[in-house]
Amino acid sequence: MDKVRLGMIGIGNMGTNHAKSLIEGLVPEMELTAIADRKEARREYCREHFPAGIRIFEEGQDLIASDVCDAVLIAVPHYQHPELTMIAFDHGKHVICEKPAGVYTKQVREMNEAAARTDQVFAMMFNQRTNSVYRKMHELVTGGELGAIKRVNWIVTDWYRTQSYYDSGSWRATWDGEGGGVLLNQCPHNLDMIQWICGLPSKVQAFCHIGKWHDIEVEDDVTAYLEYPNGATGVFITTTADAPGTNRFEITLELGKLVCENGKLMLHKLSENERTFCKTAKGGFDTPECTVTEVETDGENEQHVGVLKAFASNILHGTPLIADGIEGIRGLTLSNAMHLSSWLGHPVEIPFDEDLYLEELNKRRADSRKKEDSDVVFDTAGSY
């Protein structure tokens, strides 16, 4: 085969944008051959706006069972991600899954076990891994040239959302429909970056404020404290209610500090290891010499299209993925730990008790409000 035939399951905000990219030919080695959506209004939209040859299904399982595609992209409500992924594997389909990998790690662990039993390609839509600035941060930190991490700070409050956004779907911003708020919907990208660049912390203490700024039952404002195995600490702050918001990611290491803000990466490079300087300097107020430079990157930032290109190329040629599907559990581990810590009111060790997390989640699902359905779809371009 010279092109991967893709079936899109879910034509909501993200699915629609992915479908448009494929129809416009932005992914040369992939073609959209089928879509599935339970909403008649979305299926009718596809009949009116998509090429006539694209097959239209109501159920994702029926699309998977058909012979019209080699791979599927899963862009449905979060709880269904692992379920549909495992069904696709059973039918010999390659899978690329939208974030998050699922709602709770116990569910995603089962999905990863299924992935390990198949030869099919499994990828996650972690589009921020294509960002040249984050890739350079990953290179500098994991390469070790700046020494060990001492501190991680990320204020990411530029995820502004209106009440209209939260009212746009019956499943959105509910425990039973979405499984969480800003941590599950917007921040999987950021949490993936933290674990990809800095690794997973060993302990989390979080404060997740429920419906602080919007009429929703899930969190829209979070402050979390992180502790790492080597003694490093971190703070993660996010909300969907700050305007204007901030997006500043700082990593302090033994030989300097990286600051990512406004699309630029600045390196504050020390003349020597701070730990050595602290122990050997004679003056009580001496500080290490420091030079500040903007770090050059390759400038590439293909986002979702780049992830799809890599997925197709991996299937056809065996080239590397942007993000292996089994890595989705790592960022979810962070968000689950934050939720659990906030629910229990004390720090949570990682790994945490997955059965306890599910028990606490199900308590909230049992009381989850029912919302009226809506067919509103937003253009998500530039919002991620």
Predicted feature residues:
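Glycine-rich phosphate/pyrophosphate-binding beta-alpha loops
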Residues: 188, 213, 237-245
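Active-site beta-strand termini and strand-to-loop segments that position acidic
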Residues: 219, 224-230, 251-253
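Predominantly a Rossmann-like dinucleotide-binding segment in NAD(P)-dependent oxidoreductases
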Residues: 10, 128-215, 345
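N-terminal Rossmann-like dinucleotide-binding module
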Residues: 1-51
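Residues forming the Rossmann-fold NAD(P)(H) cofactor-binding site
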Residues: 16, 82, 188
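C-terminal glycine/acidic-rich active-site capping loop/insertion
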Residues: 228, 254-326, 348, 359-384
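Beta-strand-loop-alpha-helix segment that lines the small-molecule cofactor/substrate pocket
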Residues: 71, 77-129, 144
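Conserved SAM-binding strand-loop segment of SAM-dependent methyltransferases
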Residues: 53-60
